[in-house]
Amino acid sequence: MKAAVEKLDKNQVLLEVEVEAPRVQKAIDQAYRRLVKQVNIPGFRKGKAPRFILEQYIGKEPIYNEAAEIVIPPAYEEAVAEHQLEPIDRPEVEIVKVEDGEPLVFKARVEVKPEVQLGPYTGLEVERQEVEVTEADIDAYLKRLQERYAELEVIEDEPAAAGDIVTIDFKGTVDGQPYPGMEGNNYPLELGSGTFITGFEEQLVGARVNEERTVNVTFPSDYHEKDLAGKEAVFQVTVRGIKRKKLAPLDDEFAKDVSECETLADLRQDIRRRLEESQKQRVEAAVRQAVVEKAVAAATVELPEVMVERRIDARIRELERNLQAQKMTLEEFLKNTDKTIGDLEKEFRPGAERDVKTELVLEAIAKAENIQPSQEEIDAEIERMARIFRQDPDTVRKNLGDLSVLKYDIMIKKTIDFLVEHSKPVPPREQGAAGETAETAEATPA
């Protein structure tokens, strides 16, 4: 097989491929055997007519076209591999010549990944925040543990206070008319949690069991349901019950109840370790993101529209899956937000362009630095996945197929590792603590 490549405009190339005659003839014979089984020819059993009879009945062109469909796909893949091309779209194929005893010639026009002009990507200055956990962070963490493991005490003769959990019946109206979804019975609501519209929960503070209250609220102007945005609503609320959190004292018994620690001191030390580890992970994630952003910003590349459009489509599909988890269709979301698919595509475009450029730049750096996953790294990742999914590694390997996606993911991770290793840490600017506090850390100690 012979293949020549010509570069065209806008990341397009033209491949001209010549497939050797014996290979073409074999495909023509195979095409005849396929077609003769599909055609009813008078006087012959199906599949038994000689080729010259089939040609008289349907002509040579269908046989040649079928042979081309057999030959061209693998020949195209071979030509792409030979010239180390990276197509990003389906090729436009033109058959130049196909006939008995002659080579098949075809042309394939296809868009390929663009060339990336890399800027500096080593020695990049990246801020690295210090990891620091204070006693106040640990105290706040413990407070959250107290809240989480608090006992609920039934309140009968006292008014509801902020932090209490009230059970309510409620029914709302807008412009004097009931509105779907604005009513409920025996609904548990923690006062001060921000679960309901701003102002709703505050108006229930001081209410007693079986007391009825009229609650007036105004929906935000940017509320997700356009029909309610900016509207005033009136709720008739009946408090059916009140429960108050009873916090356990912070002592050794509390530590034993909520963790595997024997003493409160041990629990505080465990919390410190967890918060420090969480902060380290946040700092490392921030460094990785920053170094990638700088490397990408320093590079120049013409973004292929087909890759951007695919990324936009992927974002819309992800949105649709998230909506389905909330029992909402994409059509309902668009109606509620007064948007169209075109609006979503416009919103998602900047992020899609950023993703595509990041992907292309990281691939170019990996190529420049010859970064590839080793067999040991591939095996280790399969072992890790097997532990997560509680499956045999061979089963995971089989389910992954050709491992191309796994290899790509490892390559990208190693490329980012390379950027971080070759970056230059600099002190952070004065902008407050960067580490995670007890308010945002994971709440359950070992």
Curated annotation (Swiss-Prot):
UniProt GO molecular function:
peptidyl-prolyl cis-trans isomerase activity; protein folding chaperone; ribosome binding
Gene3D superfamilies, alphabetically? Answer: 3.10.50.40, Trigger factor ribosome-binding domain, Trigger factor, C-terminal domain
Any one biological process term the GO annotation gives: cell division
Q: Which UniProt keywords apply?
A: Cell cycle, Cell division, Chaperone, Cytoplasm, Isomerase, Rotamase
Q: Where in the cell is it found?
A: Cytoplasm
Primary residence: cytoplasm
| Region named Disordered | 423-446
Compositional bias annotation for Low complexity: 432-446
Q: Which GO terms describe its cellular component?
A: cytoplasm
Domain of life of the organism encoding this protein = Bacteria
Name the chemical reaction catalysed here: [protein]-peptidylproline (omega=180) = [protein]-peptidylproline (omega=0)
Tell me its family.
Belongs to the FKBP-type PPIase family. Tig subfamily.
Classification via PANTHER family: TRIGGER FACTOR CHAPERONE AND PEPTIDYL-PROLYL CIS/TRANS ISOMERASE (PTHR30560), TRIGGER FACTOR-LIKE PROTEIN TIG, CHLOROPLASTIC (PTHR30560:SF3)
- Domain comment? Consists of 3 domains; the N-terminus binds the ribosome, the middle domain has PPIase activity, while the C-terminus has intrinsic chaperone activity on its own.
This one is known as: Trigger factor
Q: Source species, please?
A: Moorella thermoacetica (strain ATCC 39073 / JCM 9320)
Q: What is the lineage of its organism?
A: Bacteria, Bacillati, Bacillota, Clostridia, Moorellales
